[in-house]
Amino acid sequence: MKTLQAKLSNKKNNFVPYIMAGDHERGLEGLNETIQLLEQAGSSAIEIGVPFSDPVADGPVIEQAGLRALAKNVSLSKILDSLKSIETEVPLVIMTYFNPVYQFGIENFVAALESTAVKGLIIPDLPKEHEAYIKPFITDKDICLVPLVSLTTPISRQKELVVDAEGFIYAVAINGVTGKENAYSNQLDHHLETLSKLTDIPVLTGFGISTLTDVERFNKVSAGVIVGSKIVRDLHENKESDVIKFIENAINF
């Protein structure tokens, strides 16, 4: 079992915060500081976004964070260089669109990851049918390709998506982009329970989670949550103490 999956399988109430690399007043020089803060608060893993000019899955908060990072000339190459010098016991997960990886060179990308604490990849615009672009390069590495599964996807398709998954399953709680609040289906709990029965891999719920009420709800029917827009917004507004308190409360339900 790879590190990311082992880490998330060991406990309930997993909390995975999302941050945008380079969205800091000191740009990438602030990345280590943010990772250490999130680790010390009790995060199970940390998702790190790569800024991209056409972020189809990102809501306005994360899209603006990406634009701020791009304005500081943050790139995938610079992010990977920064991560090489960061030591953390918490597995990192890179969230990137496929184009930056393709431009960087897939083999070079994976080789660079091996010099970092990155243990997982989320590529939202890479469908299951195209995973062969990535998987042959990470099969024997301690790196997982994490699938996103919409809870409105037919069960037959969900089975296809999770059959050989590693790390965790990213359950998309709403239709649309990240950060979209109060749009949860009444059937969501049932859908999460159904998805969890299809796999032994931890299922984490994300998209639109912004309150402790949301966290408590999803911790009951999945292995934990991924919180992006709220974390990105609070960090941008220099509310680090609020972030720490939110994570500490979230993991102690």
UniProtKB/Swiss-Prot annotation:
Catalyzed reactions: (1S,2R)-1-C-(indol-3-yl)glycerol 3-phosphate + L-serine = D-glyceraldehyde 3-phosphate + L-tryptophan + H2O
Keyword tRNA-binding: no
Active-site annotation: 47 (proton acceptor), 58 (proton acceptor)
A Pfam family hit: Trp_syntA
Keywords: Amino-acid biosynthesis, Aromatic amino acid biosynthesis, Lyase, Tryptophan biosynthesis
Keyword ATP-binding included in the entry's annotation: no
Pathway the protein takes part in: Amino-acid biosynthesis; L-tryptophan biosynthesis; L-tryptophan from chorismate: step 5/5
EC number: 4.2.1.20
Gene Ontology CC annotation, any one: cytosol
Alphabetized GO MF terms: tryptophan synthase activity
Family classification: Belongs to the TrpA family.
HAMAP family documented for this protein: Trp_synth_alpha (MF_00131)
Protein known as: Tryptophan synthase alpha chain
The organism of origin for this protein: Lactococcus lactis subsp. cremoris (strain MG1363)
